[in-house]
């Protein structure tokens, strides 16, 4: 009798999973644990978890729907450079301290416009550029080193006031230093780390590598673009150093995620800094070593407007220093000790973030959301 009862209990517990797998649907319970709304935020669900609930899923023929509103949500399969799918990415809105339910269903998904993109730009001196629906950036390559008058090191910003992807159009027309309605490049990098690049820092000096030498795209939209930039070894105060940067940008975000992996011929850790170019005229700064937070609202640049730049660590900074040309946030790197941070920019003429207050509020909210991620349960 007891064995029969146990068997029945096991069958009952397995029945919902069996029904879910056979019906071709999975319910995703989503909860927001913080007291602020989350807009256009990406969540990542391990693909193996999806396969466990929906083993027969057709990866090219499913859609994700909000059970309450019946609205279809955009999604992306993330590979991270691997042959097999790693994550299902879903972009969603969810109100403060609230819960929603989504459903994965069989069927042809709606067409959604790509919101992220990146590429190597051989026609422009080996740039590597990336963007989303909010902002665009580029890193400089080997080709630029042949033009000393134009030479620059750090991360550049291309401001936008459109949610359309603009990189290819701007490179094609060549003159992207004038705003023809969608934004422009007026940000000056020069011999600085620009809008949040990273480099070793020893004896009050930034040790810049040469510009990046190799690139690899791991994922390229529509909701997340991820790529790797690799650099040649260089000497840092008697230490030989290498770095590889894995950079990703999500749709709807002003900031990119950077994972910088440094290696050295010496075992000891060493200081590195994340830098933001500082202008001669006064701007507004919000610096917090304990929070690992560096925000800068630049002075207005004539008719071109104002750019806000910011960088965030998830751990406290060792120190933050203001020099003549840069804001520098120091942390520690070493072999097998990646530095993970977020950095990006905003433009007041996009009419979303229009003041130092709204920029600093955005940065603080961004970090709060990182520390309190959306919770996901597959039912």
Explain the meaning of each model-derived region.
Residues 22-118:
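Alpha-mannosidase-like glycoside hydrolase catalytic domains involved in N-glycan trimming
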Residues 1-26:
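Bacterial Sec-dependent N-terminal signal peptides
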Residues 103, 108-206:
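Solvent-exposed N-terminal domain segments of exported/luminal and surface proteins
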Residues 243, 255-287:
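Acidic (Asp/Glu-rich), glycine- and aromatic
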Residues 82-123, 272-284, 293-304, 311, ...:
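Extended acidic/polar, glycine-enriched regions
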Residues 86-92, 311-379:
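Beta-strand-rich recognition/accessory modules
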């Amino acid at each position: 009798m007891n064995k029969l009862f146990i068997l029945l209990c096991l069958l009952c517990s397995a029945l919902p999973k069996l029904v879910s797998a056979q019906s071709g649907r999975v319910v995703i319970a989503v909860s927001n644990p913080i007291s602020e709304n989350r807009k256009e935020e990406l969540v990542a669900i391990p693909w193996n978890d999806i396969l466990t609930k929906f083993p027969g899923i057709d990866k090219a023929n499913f859609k994700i729907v909000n059970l309450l509103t019946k609205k279809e949500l955009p999604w992306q399969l993330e590979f991270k450079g691997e042959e097999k799918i790693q994550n299902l990415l879903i972009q969603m809105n969810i109100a403060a301290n609230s819960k929603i339910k989504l459903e994965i269903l069989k069927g042809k998904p709606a067409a959604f416009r790509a919101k992220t993109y990146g590429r190597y730009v051989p026609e422009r001196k080996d740039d590597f550029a990336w963007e989303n629906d909010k902002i665009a950036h580029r890193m400089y390559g080997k080709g630029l080193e042949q033009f000393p008058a134009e030479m620059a090191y750090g991360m550049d910003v291309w401001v936008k006031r459109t949610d359309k992807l603009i990189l290819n159009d701007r490179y094609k027309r060549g003159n992207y230093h004038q705003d023809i309605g969608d934004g422009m490049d007026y940000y000056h990098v020069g011999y600085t780390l620009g809008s949040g690049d990273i480099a070793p820092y020893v004896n009050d000096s930034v040790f810049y590598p040469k510009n990046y030498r190799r690139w690899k795209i791991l994922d390229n939209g529509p909701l997340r673009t991820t790529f790797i930039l690799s650099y040649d070894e260089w000497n840092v105060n008697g230490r030989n150093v290498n770095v590889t940067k894995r950079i990703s940008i999500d749709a709807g975000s002003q900031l990119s995620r950077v994972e910088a992996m440094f290696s050295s011929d010496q075992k000891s850790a060493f200081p590195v800094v994340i830098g933001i170019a500082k202008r001669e005229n006064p701007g507004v700064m919000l610096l917090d070593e304990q929070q690992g937070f560096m925000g800068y609202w630049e002075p207005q640049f004539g008719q071109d407007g104002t750019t806000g730049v910011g960088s965030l660590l998830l751990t406290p900074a060792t120190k933050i220093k203001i020099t003549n040309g840069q804001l520098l946030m120091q942390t520690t790197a070493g072999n097998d000790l990646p530095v993970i941070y977020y950095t990006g920019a905003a433009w007041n003429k996009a009419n979303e973030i229009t003041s130092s207050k709204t920029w600093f509020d955005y940065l603080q909210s961004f970090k709060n959301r990182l520390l309190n991620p959306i919770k996901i349960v597959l039912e």
